[in-house]
Amino acid sequence: MKISAVDQSPIFSNTNANSAIRETIELAKFCDSIGMHRFWVAEHHGSDSFAGCSPEIFIPSLANETSSIRIGSGGVMLMHYSPYKVAENFRLLESLYPGRIDLGLGRAPGSNPVQAGALAYGSKTTGPEFFTTKMNDLKSFLIGENAETEAFESVDVTPGLGSLPETWLLVSSENGADLAAFFGLPMSLAHFIEQDCLHLVDRYRKNFKPSVF
């Protein structure tokens, strides 16, 4: 069995965010040293409890401090961001650390409404209702095809195609399981959030559509 870990960089009593970040680095190094398979970091904003706010910034530091364990996001909250920029960030990470990068995607905001608004900064295409559109375009940008959004059909993504990051969807609901199955994505099940969720595995397998992922 392959054992993996996700760390939210918790800020414990009498410590601070800087200490939490350093502890995550040490934990990643330990997980690598005992042969674990993956190590993911989370995205939370404006939190007094969790220090990890930017997986795409944290990932290269962790990859540089380790030797073989896969490093990834658990996850990037796609509702806030441009699929184009997410694709470029993670294709660049995959170029730097080939065969070791995971792009875990989340559908939750990872923030309160005020912080979500600050992340959007006036954009009209944020929110969970845009996830399917953004996921379609992200898929196209990752694999080097024309985006489904007509305005972006001619957009090229750098760096050029090589190996792709493994792309996952974080799931804690039936809707999430359905989306993972529809897009043919590996599913990371949030059993620590929803204990009664094993039925989602059967639902996912029943509806799964194979894809490039």
Language-model regions, residue ranges each:
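Hydrophobic faces of well-ordered beta-strands that scaffold small-molecule active sites
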Residues: 3-7, 39-41, 71-74, 101-105, ...
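Aromatic/hydrophobic pocket-lining residues that form the small-molecule binding cavity
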Residues: 20, 24, 55, 86, ...
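N-terminal beta1-alpha1-beta2 module of alpha/beta enzyme domains
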Residues: 1-66
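An alpha-helical appendage that flanks or caps ligand/catalytic pockets
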Residues: 33, 124-157, 196-213
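Acidic (Asp/Glu)-rich catalytic clusters
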Residues: 32-33, 59-68, 94-101, 181-182, ...
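Acidic-and-aromatic substrate-binding clefts and catalytic sites of carbohydrate-active enzymes
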Residues: 45-54, 79-84, 193-200
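Flexible, glycine-rich active-site loops centered on histidine and acidic residues
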Residues: 2-17, 79-145
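A conserved active-site cap/scaffold subdomain adjacent to cofactor or substrate pockets
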Residues: 175-193
